[in-house]
Amino acid sequence: MKFLDIRDTNFDMEFAAILARGEETGREVEQVVLDIIADVRARGDEALLEYTRRFDRLEADSVASLQVTEDEVDYAFARVKDEEIAALKLAVERVARFHEKQKQETWLSTGEPDILLGQMVTPLERVGIYVPGGKASYPSSVIMNAVPARVAGVGEVVMVAPTPGGEINPHVLVAARFSGVDRIFRLGGAQAVAALAYGTATVPKVDKITGPGNIYVATAKKLVFGQVGIDMIAGPSEILVINDGSGTPAHIAADLLSQAEHDELASSILITTDRGFGERVAAEVERQLAELSRETIARRSWETYGAVIVAGSLDEAIAFSNRIAPEHLELAVTNPFDVLPKIRNAGAIFLGHFTPEAAGDYLAGPNHTLPTGGTARFFSPLSVDDFVKKSSIVYFSESGLNRLGGGIVRIAELEGLEAHGRSVSVRLKGEGEARK
């Protein structure tokens, strides 16, 4: 963990190592993924079975046998505690309610009597969601990806999840049913992404792929983009807490560790105007680390990519936050609503001392699929918009074209596109009418 002062002349150099985490995919990883994608395109189901045996140690006679049955989902419900089922159902309901507010309708503008303009909103036909199944199991990832797709009106939601040993976590299956997932395959890695992007005899081709995964999954999504849509290239998780010396150090420490436990590349940063408060938080982090079941992962993350930064003022802390555009931003300050208008770049913003980032991860309502690695400068959280497409609608009556046609022709002429202009002028002059 680095204890830094933003006013030090060497601050940028010392902080650079944290900003650079996970930047290099590596040519070796990219080549491996390219080979897998090409193999799945060429051999389809046969390649999927081979990679599933190799990476997930799962023997299967066919890809069809890797599809989860309704009976298996029923059995998952029998294995999950009632209170856990209730919590997952509540999360789905709250996430659905929030995303309903994001829906856009098709609209038409009738402001001109002879011209009609508008926008048609159409749900995607089929999407694929990737649910990680590595060091932890994430039913919340199912909810955050499938629910907005369902709210958007997507026709079919296909889920893939790696299953070392052949079994999908029962909580993931419960979340999938509540979230409206149609089909689930025990497939993971770059090969699952390739199958969704190009389709095989068994796995249907989708229009868009969403959901987080390891470096191979992220690289595969990047490489198939253009063949299908993707949500974003997600990097390691991160949290930045802005603090003015108010609040409880134990609370801030717990919030920092909530990100550190994700993986060794996660970054947890506190920037505070009170050095003493920062020191108390750092000490509390050390105390709490020893209590975590995922201590090894969290400790590596904290020691390598954690930081406590002292700022000269709250405005200086805010400027720093806007510069790095964190995935998760907590405003652990006395008056968070005064600070909020000054925030320009953040994936999700959590206000006050009783709004831990974990609330947003699970059931507050907003999506937890957020831009990482500074991309909150230009990317947004996953939303209903990611599962629809928009088409422009244009209608000109004869009088409308007569009214605006001259301007269209002139712009076509100045661009040197004669046929463009003729497609209008031939109508204005009535040419071709005699040749009907």
Swiss-Prot record:
GO CC annotations, alphabetized: cytosol
Answer whether the UniProt record assigns the keyword Zinc to this protein. yes
User: Which free-text remark accompanies the cofactor?
Assistant: Binds 1 zinc ion per subunit.
Checking Pfam families in the record gives: Histidinol_dh (PF00815)
| Listed GO biological process terms | L-histidine biosynthetic process
Give its E.C. classification number. Answer: 1.1.1.23
Coiled-coil boundaries:
none
Superkingdom of this entry's organism? Bacteria
Q: What are the positions of the active site?
A: E327 (proton acceptor), H328 (proton acceptor)
Q: Which reaction does it catalyse?
A: L-histidinol + 2 NAD(+) + H2O = L-histidine + 2 NADH + 3 H(+)
Task: Cite the entry's keywords alphabetically.
Answer: Amino-acid biosynthesis, Histidine biosynthesis, Metal-binding, NAD, Oxidoreductase, Zinc
Q: Which cofactor does it need?
A: Zn(2+)
Cite the binding residues for substrate.
S237, Q259, H262, H328, D361, E415, H420
Summarizing the function annotation, the protein's role is: Catalyzes the sequential NAD-dependent oxidations of L-histidinol to L-histidinaldehyde and then to L-histidine.
The record's comment on protein family reads: Belongs to the histidinol dehydrogenase family.
Would you tell me the protein name for this molecule?
Answer: Histidinol dehydrogenase
